[in-house]
Amino acid sequence: MMCTAKKCGIRFQPPAIILIYESEIKGKIRQRIMPVRNFSKFSDCTRAAEQLKNNPRHKSYLEQVSLRQLEKLFSFLRGYLSGQSLAETMEQIQRETTIDPEEDLNKLDDKELAKRKSIMDELFEKNQKKKDDPNFVYDIEVEFPQDDQLQSCGWDTESADEF
């Protein structure tokens, strides 16, 4: 079935993902309610989102909904089931989905590192300028100021003495 996703949201009681879409055959706006079963405050949001997106009943409807958005909706549901307020859950999701430039990525485990890398890849794709963009300039020339006094680093002066 051909459809265009318009909005995707979550209902807490009873838990369900709600998709508002436009049917391309008749052009009508419709609503699809996909119940969330066997999900608790200890469930993995990524796994639940993948299972819902790959479910044969809902697959054709969720093609245009990103996996990241479904994960976020499941995170809201998990926060609700844990007893957190909506503001607390939003703050927690914001912390998880942003990259701290001062954070040492060498200290993260493999799962967290993969998550951070996927966030960085997504940000790169979003900010990347493509040839078709209206503000795209092919050859940018930048002139750097020429200071008379160049600052040298300690290891530069040490290696210069060796030669």
Swiss-Prot record:
| GO CC annotations on file | centriole; centrosome; ciliary basal body; cilium; cytosol; nucleoplasm; spindle pole
- Describe its assembly: Interacts with CEP43; this interaction is required for its localization to the mother centriole. Interacts (via residues 121-150) with RABL2B. Interacts (via C-terminus) with CEP350; this interaction is required for its localization to the mother centriole.
- Full protein name: Centrosomal protein of 19 kDa
Q: Which UniProt keywords apply?
A: Cell projection, Cilium, Cilium biogenesis/degradation, Cytoplasm, Cytoskeleton, Obesity
- Provenance organism: Homo sapiens (Human)
Tell me the organism's taxonomic lineage.
Eukaryota, Metazoa, Chordata, Craniata, Vertebrata
Per the record, the domain of life is Eukaryota
Q: What does this protein do, in the record's words?
A: Required for ciliation. Recruits the RABL2B GTPase to the ciliary base to initiate ciliation. After specifically capturing the activated GTP-bound RABL2B, the CEP19-RABL2B complex binds intraflagellar transport (IFT) complex B from the large pool pre-docked at the base of the cilium and thus triggers its entry into the cilia. Involved in the early steps in cilia formation by recruiting the ciliary vesicles (CVs) to the distal end of the mother centriole where they fuse to initiate cilium assembly. Involved in microtubule (MT) anchoring to the centrosomes.
Similarity section: Belongs to the CEP19 family.
Subcellular locations according to the entry: Cytoplasm, Cytoskeleton, Microtubule organizing center, Centrosome, Centriole; Cytoplasm, Cytoskeleton, Spindle pole; Cytoplasm, Cytoskeleton, Cilium basal body
Q: Which disease is it linked to?
A: Morbid obesity and spermatogenic failure: An autosomal recessive morbid obesity syndrome characterized by hypertension, fatty liver disease, insulin resistance, and decreased sperm counts. Variable clinical manifestations are early coronary artery disease with myocardial infarction before 45 years of age, type II diabetes mellitus, and intellectual disability. Morbid obese individuals are defined as having a BMI greater than 40.
Tell me the InterPro entries matching this sequence: CEP19
For biological process, the GO terms are:
cilium assembly; microtubule anchoring at centrosome; vesicle targeting, trans-Golgi to periciliary membrane compartment
